């Protein structure tokens, strides 16, 4: 039997997932139960779009709860104190020079479960994140991305 996938996460990422799980189990489940009760009061279920919608939402929420529980059960939390501060790892804030666009960009390296590219939180499994892991200030990396190859120079490494 294969081993369950480990989800590399920071303490902050685990906390956010725990909060989402708690919200879904306590607040969202109750809301959906109420929606189902109201929809059932309309009678005939064969053409009851409110009931169908509530049941679909319930299925989605229950699926997300299972997903979150699995991620938390298989979380591998990175202790940022165990990694040298000058080496890029999960939990690092990295300022790089992007040679393609001739600009400085700051990324926060996180586990895949925490990735949020719109807020510059990139996964350690993404091409750029993977390329930065283990590197230090002054290192230049080339990363294959969908548009070709991007070149970055590491300018700063800090901890979140």
UniProtKB/Swiss-Prot annotation:
Species name for this entry? Clostridium botulinum (strain Langeland / NCTC 10281 / Type F)
Keywords attached to this Swiss-Prot or TrEMBL record, sorted alphabetically, are: Coiled coil, DNA-binding, Transcription, Transcription regulation
Which Gene3D superfamilies does this entry report, sorted A to Z?
Transcription elongation factor, GreA/GreB, C-terminal domain, Transcription elongation factor, GreA/GreB, N-terminal domain
What is the official name of this protein in its record? Transcription elongation factor GreA
* Pfam families reported for this sequence: GreA_GreB, GreA_GreB_N
GO molecular function annotations of the record: DNA binding; RNA polymerase binding
The domain of life for this entry's organism is Bacteria
Cite the InterPro entries for this sequence: GreA/GreB_C_sf, TF_GreA/GreB_CS, Tscrpt_elong_fac_GreA, Tscrpt_elong_fac_GreA/B, Tscrpt_elong_fac_GreA/B_C, Tscrpt_elong_fac_GreA/B_fam, Tscrpt_elong_fac_GreA/B_N, Tscrpt_elong_fac_GreA/B_N_sf
